Design a protein with these regions (language model features):
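Extended, folded cores of ATP/NTP-driven motor/assembly subunits in large transport
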Residues: 1-421
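P-loop NTPase motor domains
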Residues: 66, 73-92, 99, 103, ...
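Hydrophobic anchor at the beta1->P-loop junction of P-loop NTPases
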Residues: 458
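Conserved lysine of the Walker
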Residues: 466
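Hydrophobic positions on the alpha1 helix immediately C-terminal to the Walker A/P-loop
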Residues: 469
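Post-Walker A helix-loop "phosphate-sensing" segment adjacent to the P-loop in P-loop NTPases
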Residues: 476-486
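A short helix-turn-beta junction within AAA+ P-loop NTPase domains corresponding to the substrate/partner-engaging
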Residues: 502-506, 716-729
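Conserved P-loop NTPase
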Residues: 744-799
């Protein structure tokens, strides 16, 4: 063991904490027994090994959930079989315990995760409104409970020195077994194990856990003194008190001939604090087979005795008691399972600890748990005068003091599948709200920046809530983070939100006085190429849209354009002042000066965009593109200009992203009606480039579209799907559903969440996690009024 380093000097705060712990440690009851005396372990080490008794040592692994209930039958079978193999790993030398803790969290814990702190600016009223909405959504779900799952395993050893290498080997094997199941798991260290015990013992107070290893030596206290409750009271045989909390432990009598995989899930769905503990002990295979054979011999002997009686009494010897016949056939089936079907024998103790603030509520909680057991033909029976032993057996320590065991085979034990549904509730400072988990009613709060690839797609039929979902994320992001936001808005839907957030709406149209110069050059435009090379590539794409027919630009034409681009920027590169920035007309004039007839052809094609009626892009930029939130409204650009407009906007986005990258700032780019970009080869290629390269530049693009088929129109465009780890999928049309199911590996059951689903309902793909969500945003809010795109609601707003 590594010695724990101690601080040379304790701070005043440390001393205060130690004094408080000493005061608590000195409390005893009338018999001189302290609460610490009831806690059944001897020593906890910093690496997480705990000595329970002279020769028994344990470690604890915390594991996360996976989507079992949402999986289709083949996947459920695969998970179940994987869990059977997991259980079969444990031999008779390893005792293990599965602990499921549903403990009430303090309101502060969640309030800190969801509240948006005021900034004393013009947006505080919206921040307050958004926080209130999140608090209301939280109240509807059962996020008041923190649900955790643990596997504690223990071995017998003569000393910590002998126990440690064996425990570490078993720990590695268990973590690998979890990995095979696709379950995230990690080992708890000593402080984390103490924190969990403290949480169980202090359900009434929800006090913060304060403890450091270097407090032990100067205080003379043990680890128990920092976790023990104010008191334990086990006066009555049927319940107990722990501090101000009432509790009772029951054991599950398994009476059903067949068990259901929903039993454990239903217990864990209860909306009150409870602990479910399963102590499992593998029986040595040789011993198990011998025991069953002995039982079969006993049954056969009884059968012969009954047959002899029948002969003597003069009736048919085949008529024997039905129980005897049933037990005989069941015992033979069990022997066959153990010998030839990869089944092992386990002894299971299944305990349920219910808690409440008063005896009446405790009775209600126990009744509810009992009803769940009865639903599955089992019985929940209160422990009589064993409440203390029951409570201590429910702690994730790996100690079972209740000797009520039921023998089960591997597959019968595995039916208590410890997986239900994944949760997505991240506590990070930039975790945004995406709705409520449709399976558990818990908030979905995630930070896209934590994904390997934060690129995203919002997909759905018209009216399913695509634009609204994008606006909600934009508002949340604006209020909570410092990210810049750029929107490409082909339908003029985002202006009310952008204006309320004091952003800049740039309306680009032939009649507008808002101008953007497509020739704008940022000298940081590229990381690995010269800015001019990348700009030349953009202008080639622009000219290809303008000039190129079906075959695009010819090699000679490309050479001429590249030559002119390098010439047109000479003045600006020598003296980079805004007034020296070239415009499209400067390029046009240079082309006119070239000798080749191809140059004249290109210049003629450009003429309408320079001196003709479509000259909206032949001006120096005169709008503030440095605002934190910028919306490019291109609705009024005609058919000819819209494609060019979208390409120019994408180039502006590159400019902004490169500036922000130098400032270590993220840029979020929202592309509504994204299918319009994918129809043209040039804009599609540029979009694919954004999806490939944005991440390392600090960019987070989000495509919003109803046309899934356009996303899969070519192998090149398919890269957008492959490079999007975030997909917010709303209601889908029949044909699109099948395409998406194949592309994203969605099960039939999961597809039901995007089939004829209501507005704001669907599936969220976050990395490898898939969750069904519901987002019903309150309509009586200012944010809803500025985000809605429903014509009747917009008309109502205008009438007001």
């Amino acid at each position: 063991m590594q010695p724990v380093k101690t601080k040379k000097k304790l701070s005043r705060a440390d001393k205060k904490q130690i004094e408080a712990a000493i005061a608590r440690a000195n409390r005893t009851d009338k018999k001189g027994k302290s609460a610490q005396d009831s806690i059944p372990y001897e020593r906890m080490w910093p690496d997480g090994i705990c000595r329970i008794s002279d020769s028994h040592y344990t470690k604890t692994i915390q594991f996360q959930d996976i989507n079992y209930q949402l999986s289709q039958n083949e996947d459920k079978t695969a998970i179940f079989e994987g869990w059977c193999d997991f259980l079969n790993y444990f031999d008779s030398s390893i005792h293990f315990q599965l602990s499921f803790l549903n403990l009430a969290a303090s309101e502060e814990t969640f309030a800190n995760s969801i509240s948006i702190p005021p900034q004393r600016d013009a947006f505080d009223s919206i921040r307050e409104e958004y926080t209130t909405m999140l608090q209301n959504q939280l109240a509807r779900g059962n996020n008041g409970l923190i649900k955790t799952k643990y596997l504690t395993f223990g071995i017998d050893a003569d000393s910590i020195k002998a126990a440690k290498p064996r425990l570490e080997r078993i720990e590695t094997d268990i973590l690998n077994n979890f990995k095979r199941l696709g379950v995230a798991a990690r080992t708890l260290d000593g402080k984390e194990r103490l924190f969990q015990l403290h949480a169980v013992f202090h359900m009434d107070e929800q006090l913060p856990f304060q403890f450091e290893w270097d407090w032990l030596a100067p205080s003379g206290l043990s680890t128990k003194d920092f976790i023990a409750p104010s008191s334990f009271e086990f006066r009555t045989g049927k319940q107990f008190r722990m501090g101000k909390k009432y509790g009772a432990v029951s054991f599950l009598q398994i009476l059903a001939p067949e068990l259901n995989d929903r039993l454990l899930a239903d217990f864990l769905d209860m909306e009150s604090s409870l602990i479910v503990s399963m102590h499992i002990q593998s029986v040595d295979q040789v011993k198990a087979i011998k025991t069953v054979k002995r039982k079969i011999t006993d049954l056969d002997r009884s059968k012969i005795e009954e047959q002899k009686k029948a002969v003597r009494a003069g009736y048919d010897m085949d008529i024997i008691p039905s129980d005897l016949a049933t037990y005989g056939s069941e015992a033979k089936k069990l022997l066959q399972d153990l010998q030839s079907r990869n089944e092992r024998m386990f002894l299971l103790t299944f305990l349920v600890l219910n808690t409440a603030d008063n005896p009446r509520q405790l009775g209600n909680n126990i009744f509810q748990a009992g009803s769940i057991a009865q639903k599955y033909n089992c019985q929940l029976t209160r422990l009589d005068f064993q409440q203390e032993e029951g409570l201590m057996s429910c702690l994730p320590l790996g100690l079972n003091q209740i000797e009520i065991q039921r023998g089960l085979t591997t597959s019968s034990t595995a039916i208590f599948v410890p997986f239900t549904t994944q949760e997505l509730f991240q506590n990070g400072k930039e975790a945004l709200y995406y709705g409520i988990n449709a399976l558990s009613n818990n908030l979905i709060m995630v930070d896209r920046k934590l994904l390997k690839n934060p690129n995203g797609l919002i997909l759905g039929t018209p009216g399913s809530g695509k634009s609204f979902s994008a606006k909600r994320e934009i508002a949340n992001c604006f209020l909570l983070t410092s990210d810049d936001v750029i929107i490409c808005d082909p339908e003029a839907e985002y202006a009310p939100l952008v204006e309320r957030l004091h952003g800049q709406v740039i309306k680009i149209s032939p009649t507008s006085t808002n101008y953007i110069n497509p020739m704008d050059l940022n000298l940081d435009y590229s990381d690995d190429e010269s800015p001019l090379s990348l700009k030349s590539d953009f202008i080639l794409s622009l000219c290809e849209l303008i000039v190129g027919g079906k075959e695009g630009l010819q090699p000679v034409q490309k050479t001429i354009i590249d030559r002119c681009v390098r010439l047109v920027y000479q003045t600006y590169l020598n003296d980079p002042r805004p007034e020296n920035m070239p415009v499209l007309e400067d390029l046009y004039n240079l082309l006119r000066e070239q000798e080749e007839k191809e140059a004249q052809y290109i210049a003629t094609a450009l003429e309408i965009y320079v001196t003709g009626s479509l000259n909206v892009f032949n001006h120096q930029s005169n709008v503030d593109i440095n605002n934190r939130i910028v919306c490019y409204d291109i609705k009024e650009l005609g058919k000819q200009l819209k494609k060019i407009g979208m390409l120019v906007v994408q180039d502006q986005v590159w400019n902004r992203v490169t500036i922000n990258r130098a400032a270590h700032k993220s840029t979020r780019y929202y592309i509504d009606e994204m299918h319009l970009l994918l129809k043209e080869e040039q804009t599609a290629a540029y979009t694919v480039e954004i999806w490939k390269r944005f991440r390392k530049w600090g960019g987070i693009p989000t495509g919003i579209t109803q046309n899934v088929k356009d996303l899969l129109s070519s192998r090149e465009v398919e890269h957008i799907f492959e490079n999007s780890d975030f997909v917010y999928m709303l209601n889908q049309a029949g044909g699109d559903r099948q395409i998406l199911a194949k592309q994203l590996g969605i099960s039939t059951h999961q597809l039901s969440y995007v089939t004829h689903s209501g507005e704001g309902e669907g599936l969220l793909f976050y990395g490898s996690t898939i969750l069904p969500f519901v987002d019903h945003f309150p309509k009586n809010t200012e944010l809803y009024r500025i985000m809605t795109t429903k014509p009747q609601e917009l008309k109502k707003k205008e009438d007001e």
